[in-house]
Curated annotation (Swiss-Prot):
InterPro entries: OMP_Chaperone_SurA, PPIase_dom_sf, PPIase_PpiC, PPIase_SurA, SurA_N, Trigger_fact/SurA_dom_sf
Organismal lineage: Bacteria, Pseudomonadati, Pseudomonadota, Gammaproteobacteria, Oceanospirillales
A Gene Ontology term for the protein's cellular component: outer membrane-bounded periplasmic space
Function of the protein: Chaperone involved in the correct folding and assembly of outer membrane proteins. Recognizes specific patterns of aromatic residues and the orientation of their side chains, which are found more frequently in integral outer membrane proteins. May act in both early periplasmic and late outer membrane-associated steps of protein maturation.
GO biological process, one term: protein stabilization
Gene: surA
Annotated EC: 5.2.1.8
PROSITE patterns: PPIC_PPIASE_2 (PS50198)
Domain remark from Swiss-Prot or TrEMBL: The PPIase activity resides only in the second parvulin domain. The N-terminal region and the C-terminal tail are necessary and sufficient for the chaperone activity of SurA. The PPIase activity is dispensable for SurA to function as a chaperone. The N-terminal region and the C-terminal tail are also required for porin recognition.
Domain PpiC: 180-281, 290-390
Protein name, UniProt field: Chaperone SurA
Single Gene Ontology MF annotation: peptidyl-prolyl cis-trans isomerase activity
Signal peptide positions on this chain: 1-29
Record keywords, A-Z: Chaperone, Isomerase, Periplasm, Repeat, Rotamase, Signal
Species per Swiss-Prot/TrEMBL record: Alcanivorax borkumensis (strain ATCC 700651 / DSM 11573 / NCIMB 13689 / SK2)
The reaction(s) this protein catalyses: [protein]-peptidylproline (omega=180) = [protein]-peptidylproline (omega=0)
Length: 435
């Protein structure tokens, strides 16, 4: 099954919305100076020109938002740190053979365009008019998707939530609040190495306490996050966005629940370091009526005897035969689908809630009209095509609450383990910064 109860989704569109790492075309027209290496990452390198291009783009974004930039040295350090983590994960993905095909990339780009109320062609034209390279934007989105798939394979696929855990969670105060409130949190992280010496821990603790003192004296949380945080959202002022209360990591949820709007926490210790949270805002939570989709699909997977390209061609052939009326969808799924859970039922997945499936599947499901066949598309599980048989609005039932609770626990566990995993991979890698 590709159901999210087995595979936690790391919100892809959240990553895509952050794909602001486009390279302005005009920056390429500058006189080319002698390039140099600013960081060695295992067997790869980050060049000064790459870093400068990224900094130029982020500086433009700050300017457009009317935000104050940190000092050039701090901005350079923050951007380079982000690029190092990206490069490490892309190297891991390449070794694991993780790729994103053109069809999946185009579907993701179309989703971004729809979010901006544009067609894909209009969206591309708008970017070009604003001086950005469409080719480089596409490549950045592809890299974001590759990293997301790597994280799914390396972290999310190991997470299993038991019925007993769900029962305990639903009966807890936090579980009850999950259906009542959403939190928007700000975050500052003072990183501590995984095998830190006592002196390093003391220095990090002292730095976190100094930040608290500055906040208490009236300093701006967003500016401190940009200048001092080691977190992945530092350049967004530490803003982690909105989530249901229970979808935050346990450490965050339990300490944020009593914060009023505008308040911040004391330093919180985790394996990654010291965290400071700010309650940017809080509001009422999930709606009681949800849209559900009755879906069937066919999955064709690559294996030891079938290459990814052969699996794709097989999926396309079966899709075209169903579309031409040469085959029935149900019989095709029963005979050929590599998803045994649904194949025996003619590919039927039953009623599916928005947010329940992996991103690539959900995106296609939401954009396929009732009764029509979707294009062939790729997810981390293989090649699919699907049909939406019906759509309905349903009251939030006990079953749906359990599904929401399972997703919340998965997302929480994923965030906790992802942070540790990224830090471990960086510790295991050779990184030489040459700023």
């Amino acid at each position: 099954m590709i159901n999210k109860t087995l595979h936690t989704k790391h919100t892809l569109l959240g990553l895509l919305a952050m794909a602001v790492l486009m390279i302005p075309v005009w920056s390429q027209a500058k006189v080319q100076m002698l390039d140099r290496i600013v960081a060695v990452v295992n067997d790869g390198a980050i060049m000064a020109s790459e870093l400068d291009e990224r900094i130029n783009t982020i500086a433009l974004q700050f300017q457009e938002k009317g935000q104050q930039l940190p000092s050039p040295a701090i901005l350079r350090e923050q951007v380079l740190d982000r690029m190092i983590l990206e490069r490490l994960q892309l190297q891991l993905a390449e070794r694991a053979g993780i790729k994103v095909d053109e069809a999946s990339l185009n579907e993701a780009l179309a989703g971004i365009a729809r979010q901006n109320d544009m067609s894909l062609e209009d969206f591309a034209a708008t970017l070009r008019e604003d001086g950005y390279s469409w080719t480089q934007f596409r490549e950045q989105i592809r890299q974001d998707m590759v990293i997301s798939r790597l994280q799914q394979r390396s972290v999310a696929s190991r997470i299993q939530i038991t019925d007993r855990e769900v029962d305990r969670f639903l009966s807890s105060e936090l579980g009850k609040q999950m259906f009542q409130e959403d939190f928007r949190l700000g975050h500052i992280l003072i990183r501590v190495p995984s095998e830190a010496r006592p002196q390093q821990i003391s220095q990090a603790r002292a730095k976190a306490k100094e930040i608290i003192e500055r906040l208490e004296a009236g300093s701006d949380f967003q500016q401190l996050a940009i200048a001092l945080s080691d977190g992945p959202n530092a350049l967004e002022g530490g803003d982690l966005g909105w989530r249901p209360a229970a979808q935050w990591p346990t450490l965050f949820a339990e300490n944020a629940i009593n914060l009023k709007k505008g308040e911040f926490s004391q330093p919180l210790r985790s394996g990654a370091g010291f965290h400071i949270l700010k309650m940017i805002d809080r509001k009422g939570g999930a709606e009681k009526v949800v849209t559900q989709y009755h879906v069937r699909h066919v999955l064709i997977k690559a294996d030891a005897l079938t290459s990814a390209e052969q699996a794709q061609q097989r999926a396309i052939r079966l899709h075209d035969e169903v579309a031409a009326g040469k085959r029935q969808f149900k019989e095709t799924a029963a005979e050929f689908s590599d998803d045994p859970g649904s194949a025996r039922n003619g590919g039927e997945l039953g009623w599916v809630n928005k947010g329940e499936m992996v991103p690539e599947f959900e995106q296609v499901m939401l954009n396929t009209p009732v009764g029509e066949l979707s294009p062939v598309f790729e997810s981390q599980f293989g090649w699919h095509f699907l049909r939406v048989d019906d759509i309905r609005d349903a009251d939030m039932s006990t079953e749906f609450r359990r599904m929401q609770a399972t997703q919340a626990l998965q997302k929480r566990r994923f965030e906790e383990e992802l942070e540790t995993w990224v830090q471990e991979k960086r510790s295991e890698s050779y990184v030489d910064i040459r700023l």
